């Protein structure tokens, strides 16, 4: 860990997601030092200059520079946004083989620097790539985190807040499972401004069809955005910044991230989106929400989908 300086993040991958995350960190002054690594060194040079020019208006000064893998040796957090991008019509799981090869190289380079901090992975398919990062790095599971369903849960809360005309922060509802097509909403524990969703729906019979559509919109949002503008990046960048903030401020915040399960939710040896307590040490523990039978069945299906894909991946054997 970075014992002698302020909080240091090394960002690997300066594409749309990575550069949006970098801007979020600087804009909110979440870090003291940000190092950016990418094969496109000229774009990194330009972004570093641009971000530096923004720092006079950030709450506190953030040091930003272009770097190399050797800069990871004293980093508190290495965030990986590098990898092949998702194309229109392509699922996140289609990206597996391409990105596993990329990650084996990246994680090897990071660990060669004597890195001893926390990994945060955003590249898709995130649940599989964070599992690969854990395997390739040899770090404890607590210090390898995936962005998981943090963005899906944010989309879900936003749409529910609009349906019930309250602020998103007044909605407590989670999307869990794979960050992808098999994810599921935890309807049984959703509440709006402290009122159980089930109770509210009893007062609005027409609302059941509406909330089912809300989940479909949540699940398919990425495809809609990719079709419209080629990629999603602002939402996930803010989600990554939120996880980073929870780590550096030692918040013990509960966020829906991709964490390794070891018996929780009746699953083993799979990274998947679940609520977890996040603090300076990474994942303190997984929060096990009691699911109803339907939710448990869907969660098991989601986990099996990921396990089946990993079983076919030569890089993980």
Swiss-Prot record:
Q: Which UniProt keywords apply?
A: Cytoplasm, NAD, Oxidoreductase, Phosphoprotein, Stress response
Catalytic activity field: (S)-lactate + NAD(+) = pyruvate + NADH + H(+)
- Keyword Ribonucleoprotein assigned to the entry: answer is no
Binding annotation for substrate: 86, 92, 124-127, 152-155, 232
Pathway given for this chain reads: Fermentation; pyruvate fermentation to lactate; (S)-lactate from pyruvate: step 1/1
Q: Which Pfam families match?
A: Ldh_1_C (PF02866), Ldh_1_N (PF00056)
Which domain of life does the protein's organism represent?
A: Bacteria
Q: Where is the active site?
A: 179 (proton acceptor)
Q: What is its EC number?
A: 1.1.1.27
Which residues are annotated as modified residue Phosphotyrosine in the UniProt record? Answer: 223
Q: Which GO terms describe its molecular function?
A: L-lactate dehydrogenase activity
| Binding residue positions for NAD(+) | 17, 38, 43, 69, 83-84, 105, 122-124, 147
Q: Does the keyword Cytoplasm apply?
A: yes
Q: Enumerate the subcellular locations listed in this protein's record, separating them with semicolons.
A: Cytoplasm
The UniProt function text for this chain reads: Catalyzes the conversion of lactate to pyruvate (Potential). Appears to be the primary factor that allows S.aureus growth during nitrosative stress in both aerobically and anaerobically cultured cells.
Q: Which HAMAP family match?
A: Lactate_dehydrog
Q: How does it assemble?
A: Homotetramer.
The protein depicted here goes by the name L-lactate dehydrogenase 1
Its lineage reads: Bacteria, Bacillati, Bacillota, Bacilli, Bacillales
Gene, per the UniProt record: ldh1
């Amino acid at each position: 860990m970075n014992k002698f300086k302020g909080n240091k993040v090394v960002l690997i991958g300066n594409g749309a997601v990575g550069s949006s995350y970098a801007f979020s960190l600087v804009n909110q002054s979440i870090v003291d030092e940000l190092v950016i690594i990418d094969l496109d060194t000229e774009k990194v040079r330009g972004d570093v200059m641009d971000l530096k020019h923004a720092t006079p208006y950030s709450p506190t000064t953030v040091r930003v520079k272009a770097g190399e893998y050797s800069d990871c040796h004293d980093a508190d957090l290495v965030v990986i946004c590098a990898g092949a991008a998702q194309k229109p019509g392509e699922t996140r799981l289609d990206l597996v083989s391409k990105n596993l090869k990329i990650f084996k190289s990246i994680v090897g380079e990071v660990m060669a620097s004597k890195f001893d901090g926390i990994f945060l992975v955003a590249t898709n398919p995130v649940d599989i790539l964070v599992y690969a990062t854990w395997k390739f790095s040899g770090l404890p599971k607590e210090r390898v985190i995936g962005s998981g369903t943090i963005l899906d849960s944010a989309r879900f809360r936003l749409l529910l807040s609009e349906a019930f005309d309250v602020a998103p922060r007044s909605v407590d509802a989670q999307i869990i499972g794979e960050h992808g097509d098999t994810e599921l909403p935890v309807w049984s524990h959703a509440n709006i401004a402290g009122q159980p969703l089930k109770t509210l729906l009893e007062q609005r019979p027409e609302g059941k069809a509406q909330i089912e559509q809300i989940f479909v919109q949540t699940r398919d949002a990425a495809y809609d955005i990719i079709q419209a503008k080629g990629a999603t990046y602002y939402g996930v960048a803010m989600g990554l910044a939120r996880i980073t903030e929870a780590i550096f401020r030692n918040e013990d915040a509960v966020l829906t991230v991709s964490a390794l399960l070891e018996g929780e939710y009746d699953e083993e040896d799979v990274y998947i989106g679940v609520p977890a307590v996040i603090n300076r040490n990474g994942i303190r523990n997984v929060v096990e929400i009691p699911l109803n039978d339907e939710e448990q069945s869907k969660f098991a299906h989601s986990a099996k989908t990921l396990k089946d894909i990993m079983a076919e991946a030569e890089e993980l054997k």
